Each structure stands twice: as C-alpha cells, then as structure tokens.
Amino acid sequence: MTPAPFHAELADAPPGAVAVWLKPGAMRIRVAWWKAGDRGTVMLLPGRTECIEKYGRAAGDLVRRGYSVITIDWRGQGLADRALPDPMSGHVGDFAEYQQDLDAMLAEADRAGLPQPRFLLAHSM
C-alpha cells in the first residue's frame, strides 16, 4: 500500500481520510477511505470525469451516521493513470478494466478492515 494525495481543503470531507495508490493491472488508481462506526461500509463510486474529492461532503454525511466509506478514482479519472497521453482523456480499452478497479477497491476495503455489510452509492458510469 502506497500513500496517495488527498486534497482535504477541496473535499470538505471528514477528518481521518486514508488515500492509497493501488495497481490493478498496468494502471495505478487512487482509493480513499474513512473508518467510522459499525453500521457497514458505503462504497461511493464516482461518475465519469469525477474524482474522490467531489464526494467529500457525502462521505462526511455518511461517517456522521456511523458508516465507513470507501471511494475510488477509476482509471482515466481524477488522479488515476490514463491509458492515453492526453490528461483529459478517460479512455479504457475494455469495460472489464473498471471491474479490475472495483475488485482492487474491494480488496482494499477488506485489507483496511472496513465493516460489513457493504452498500453501494454510484453515479453515472
């Protein structure tokens, strides 16, 4: 697990964010999480062109309600690696690559000891 940046001043997120780089396949993605109460873990899945920091307030609302939260910069989004040289491009060769990203995020949730059950809150993609 390699620490990754988290821009708290932009996110308006709760304290205690842990951000890490993960590398499913050839691309590096960024995952952030907050460990809170024992009500379970909400997996916040941002939409296309979005980043972890956009969901800081939502994470704060969930943490205040006793949920842990984990979220992701999908490959080609936020601070994650891109497949093409253009930093504004979010291209993937196959949608299955997003499944690899999700698998890596779930493995990080397990590694971090984030509580069950898991809930999904997603936008766009």
Residue ranges and their predicted role:
Residues 1-23, 29-34, 120:
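An N-terminal hydrophobic leader/cap segment in hydrolases
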Residues 52, 59-85:
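Conserved alpha/beta-hydrolase
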Residues 27, 51:
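Donor nucleotide-sugar binding loop of glycosyltransferases
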Residues 113-124:
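Alpha/beta-hydrolase fold nucleophile elbow
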Residues 39, 47-50, 125:
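Active-site glycine-rich loops that stabilize anionic/oxyanionic intermediates
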Residues 90-111:
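Alpha/beta-hydrolase active-site loop
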Residues 35-41, 67, 114-116:
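Proline/glycine-enriched tight loop/beta-turn segments at coil->beta junctions
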Residues 44-47, 71:
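Structural cue for short, hydrophobic secondary-structure segments
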